[in-house]
């Protein structure tokens, strides 16, 4: 396992590609034109800032960022402190409460403590226009995040990928199941959670898979910075 590579090494090449330059240019122009784009510019690449390539243990794929005020901050499913947990995250907490002994549902939806333990919270599209779900789909972000997943697949071994819903599962087709652990279920959204997300036990399974490799388990209780 080559642990010396960083996200900077892996992604520097992508940043030279025309598709990536065009994507950032489009988003920059939208912001300049006065449109509200989430997350704020400084937070777009937070998934990579909080979880370095060699630290990744678990990958949770989301779709695109939350498009309501003060929600998105660059980590899939997570919202800023002080913002109520959206419905999908509420179902994630519900599953954790039934899966992990002693888990108590927190009053916040800030998942940065997961990221700091090696859970890469990656959306497949990294920006969105306020109030317009999927408005930045097919701009080029999907190509970028495909390259990210390919880098994880090739540079690391024994990662646990949690793929919830058909979008994430299709995205995960490039993952080699001989090198990594791939757990699949329906999406935690209220539309589909009852079809098999609730009861999937992915969080305890992920910890078992990590411990079998001699790695520390994830503390799935999300902690605000002052609780750390």
From Swiss-Prot:
The domain of life for this entry's organism is Bacteria
Task: Tell me which Pfam families the record gives.
Answer: UDG
Q: What is its EC number?
A: 3.2.2.27
Q: Name one GO cellular component term.
A: cytoplasm
Catalysed reactions, as listed in the record = Hydrolyzes single-stranded DNA or mismatched double-stranded DNA and polynucleotides, releasing free uracil
Q: Report the sequence similarity comment from the record.
A: Belongs to the uracil-DNA glycosylase (UDG) superfamily. UNG family.
Q: What is this protein called?
A: Uracil-DNA glycosylase
Organism expressing this protein natively: Pectobacterium atrosepticum (strain SCRI 1043 / ATCC BAA-672) (Erwinia carotovora subsp. atroseptica)
């Amino acid at each position: 396992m080559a642990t010396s590579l960083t996200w900077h090494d892996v992604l520097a090449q992508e940043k030279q590609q025309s598709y990536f330059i065009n994507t950032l240019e489009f988003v920059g122009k939208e912001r300049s034109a006065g449109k509200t784009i989430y997350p704020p510019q400084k937070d777009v690449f937070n998934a990579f800032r909080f979880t370095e390539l060699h630290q990744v243990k678990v990958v949770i794929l989301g779709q695109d960022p939350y498009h309501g005020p003060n929600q998105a901050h660059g980590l899939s499913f997570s919202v800023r402190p002080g913002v109520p947990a959206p419905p999908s995250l509420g179902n994630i907490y519900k599953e954790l409460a039934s899966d992990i002994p002693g888990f108590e549902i927190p009053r916040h939806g800030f998942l940065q403590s997961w990221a700091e333990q090696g859970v890469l919270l990656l959306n497949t599209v990294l920006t969105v226009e306020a109030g317009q779900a999927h408005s930045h789909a097919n701009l080029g972000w999907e190509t970028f995040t495909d390259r990210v997943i390919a880098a994880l697949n090739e540079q690391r071994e024994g990662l646990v990928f949690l793929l919830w819903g058909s979008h994430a599962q299709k995205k995960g087709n490039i993952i080699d199941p001989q090198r990594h652990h791939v757990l699949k279920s329906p999406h935690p959204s209220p539309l589909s959670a009852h079809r098999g997300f609730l009861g999937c036990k992915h969080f305890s399974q992920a910890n078992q898979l990590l411990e079998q490799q001699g790695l520390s388990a994830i503390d799935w209780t999300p902690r605000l910075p002052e609780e750390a």
